[in-house]
Amino acid sequence: MTSHPSFTAARLRRWLLALACCSFAALAQAQALPAKFDATRDAAADVRTAVGLAKAQGKQVLVDVGGEWCIWCHILDKFIATHAPVKRLVDENFVVVKVNFSPQNRNEAVLSQWPKIKGYPHLFVLDAEGRLVHSQDTGELEAGKDYDEAKVIAFLEKHRRAK
């Protein structure tokens, strides 16, 4: 009888260790995605990582294409960070990956698989399998010198993963 409880304890320890390893792996992958546009990043690898995270987390992928040179890219980043309803929708429904477009790195191999971009930033929504769901010209989401919260929320709600 004493072997049965220790067997259960051993199984529990293995299960907890496996859970901890998975948690650390997911955290490491999430931290591996760029927080800003970086010409030195491997965009294809970043998109693959984002798709893997989206699949594991039941989310869509929001591919944000732009560059550090792009004023509207920074305006969009600030807009998302400072508008709680928008930030909540993004955080709860999307894995965000930034793909650089600049003279140093146009990331043509990655970007050529999706529709042409007219301006920056540009957003692509991918499903958890990496398939294109939507291509969004962010100019359509603007209002004056900022973004329109209602338009951004409508875009995010329309393209989040059905639950």
Name what the model sees in each region.
Residues 118-162:
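Non-catalytic, surface beta->alpha helical segment in thiol-disulfide oxidoreductase systems
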Residues 2-17:
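Bacterial N-terminal signal peptides that target proteins for export
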Residues 15-26:
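Bacterial N-terminal signal peptides
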Residues 81, 86-106:
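Thiol-based oxidoreductase modules, predominantly thioredoxin-like and allied folds used
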Residues 28-32:
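Boundary at the C-terminal end of the N-terminal hydrophobic targeting segment
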Residues 57-68:
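Short active-site neighborhood of thiol/selenol oxidoreductases, capturing the structured segment around
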Residues 39-59:
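A short beta-strand-turn-helix
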Residues 67-81:
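Conserved redox-active cysteine motifs that mediate thiol-disulfide chemistry
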